Amino acid sequence: MPEIRQVMEQVEVELRRATALHGPMRSSHEGLGVLVEEMLELVLAVTTNDLAAVTAEALQVAAMGARIVLDLAPSDPS
């Protein structure tokens, strides 16, 4: 079983790849759309019992969640 640090490093790699490819998210609606798309891909991977795809899609879901926070969260959360 992977360690938390290894998983987070994989999430960071995916986050950086997606940001380099698509740029920052511009709205919460865009963020939701991207996150839902990745979730649907995760659901498909689970329903086909493709564990390699489940892992890849779960990492993408985590990375897109992080992108929403990084790209759209207010600079001063208070």
Features from the language model and the residues they span:
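Flexible "arm" and connector segments at domain edges
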Residues: 1-78
